[in-house]
């Protein structure tokens, strides 16, 4: 691995494709920019840790859910889809992007040149829209429990639609991504002989900007706004429900339960937004005016933003699985290579799973304090 983040080529400009989500050109002038070996080593350790945690965490989550028949509900089906897409991101995005950013050329062949950005874009789109479907399921469960509720069949149809949309929106990478030695043709240095770069060749800059702007809305701002609205409505409904029970419940118990629910809902939205915000800003700035970013700071800044976004592949299994007691219990069997036990009688209802208990204003007025406590506890388990 080359320790330099940029190649010094006298009187020539070399174009690279660095973005994992939005392909683009970057002209490197006659700058002598180096990343310290200590920095490269630190980044390599960080990327390695994220890859290991992302692959093992999502793989464990998928196996645990698929092994337990009683866990195959709407939310868990969507969680498996989310984990599978995150697994692809951890495998396809992290190692290839990290190596290519630090090297001065592409070494993975023409097929991977096209497949890498295509699979990355597909995986990211699937991950984000899986979060959207989970938000929709929660919204219907809490806001409209007596109305339409998604079942397993709806979940499978939704997943199929997501993958079709993801593949369709990612096709430009498959079409316009090219492997070429064009930037090195006029370079006389031996170090650049038989070297290739992988970048996109859109028909024009306007086509490229239109496409990357569409991805910006499709993969970040649109889903984020929708998810925020869903969780805000859920928060308002739960807060109103808690206020109706103020006089019938122990105040300490009510406060702790409300706090747990609110923290979980807030964490889900914040984790998604915070992880992807740096890379989104970087891509947007670079698309419209790459000269704003100093040449010598480009690689390091991109890797830090990219690494932050990839941390989301580790965060999701924690929020959507490992904070639940069922997964903590099953993980002990998973990592000890023991068989999973069937727990039909004592299996705790997984957080966020669909249940058929709802609370109306009439039932709140008529129910006893003991019954209310039980109903509210069941409702909390649905989140």
UniProtKB/Swiss-Prot annotation:
Key words of the record: Cell membrane, Disulfide bond, G-protein coupled receptor, Glycoprotein, Lipoprotein, Membrane, Palmitate, Phosphoprotein, Receptor, Transducer, Transmembrane, Transmembrane helix
Main localization category: membrane
GO biological process: feeding behavior; glucose metabolic process; locomotory behavior; outflow tract morphogenesis; regulation of blood pressure; regulation of multicellular organism growth; sensory perception of pain
Transmembrane parts of this sequence: 45-65, 77-97, 117-137, 155-175, 212-232, 261-281, 300-320
One matching Pfam family: 7tm_1
Disulfide bonds: 113-198
Annotated positions of the Phosphoserine modification: 368
Glycan attachment residues as annotated in the record: 2, 11, 17, 186
Membrane topology (UniProt): Multi-pass membrane protein
Single GO term (MF): peptide YY receptor activity
Lipid attachment in record (S-palmitoyl cysteine): 338
UniProt keyword Phosphoprotein present: yes
Role: Receptor for neuropeptide Y and peptide YY.
Protein name: Neuropeptide Y receptor type 1
Organism for this UniProt entry: Bos taurus
Gene name of the encoded protein: NPY1R
């Amino acid at each position: 691995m080359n320790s330099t983040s940029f190649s010094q080529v006298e009187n020539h400009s070399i174009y690279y494709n660095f973005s994992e989500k939005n392909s683009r050109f970057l002209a490197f002038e006659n700058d002598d920019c180096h990343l310290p070996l200590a920095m490269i080593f630190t980044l390599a350790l960080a990327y390695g840790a994220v890859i290991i945690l992302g692959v093992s965490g999502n793989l464990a989550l998928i196996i645990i859910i698929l092994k337990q028949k009683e866990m195959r509900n709407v939310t868990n089906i969507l969680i498996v889809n989310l984990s599978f897409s995150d697994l692809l991101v951890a495998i396809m995005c992290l190692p290839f992007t990290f190596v290519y950013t630090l090297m001065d050329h592409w070494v993975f062949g023409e097929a991977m040149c096209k497949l890498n950005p295509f699979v990355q874009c597909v995986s990211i789109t699937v991950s984000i829209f899986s979060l959207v479907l989970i938000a929709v399921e929660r919204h219907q469960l809490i806001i409209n429990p007596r109305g339409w509720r998604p079942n397993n069949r709806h979940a499978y149809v939704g997943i199929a639609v997501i993958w079709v949309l993801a593949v369709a929106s990612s096709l430009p990478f498959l079409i316009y991504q090219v492997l070429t030695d064009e930037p090195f043709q006029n370079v006389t240095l031996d170090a650049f002989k038989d070297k290739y770069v992988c970048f996109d060749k859109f028909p024009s800059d306007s086509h490229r900007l239109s496409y990357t702007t569409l991805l910006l809305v499709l993969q970040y701002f649109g889903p984020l706004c929708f998810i925020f609205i869903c969780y805000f409505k859920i928060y308002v409904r739960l807060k109103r429900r808690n206020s109706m029970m103020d006089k019938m419940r122990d105040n300490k118990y009510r406060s702790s339960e409300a706090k747990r629910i609110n923290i979980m809902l807030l964490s889900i939205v914040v984790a998604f937004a915070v992880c992807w915000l740096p890379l989104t800003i970087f891509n947007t700035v670079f698309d419209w005016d790459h000269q704003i970013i100093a040449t010598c700071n480009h690689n390091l800044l991109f890797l830090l933003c990219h690494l932050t976004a990839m941390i989301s592949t580790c965060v999701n299994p924690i929020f959507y699985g490992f904070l639940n007691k069922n997964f903590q219990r099953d993980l002990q069997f998973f990592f000890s290579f023991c068989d999973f036990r069937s727990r039909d009688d004592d299996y705790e209802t997984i957080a966020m799973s669909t249940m058929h208990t709802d609370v109306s204003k009439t039932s709140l007025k008529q129910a006893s304090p003991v019954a209310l406590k039980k109903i509210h506890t069941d409702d909390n388990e649905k989140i």
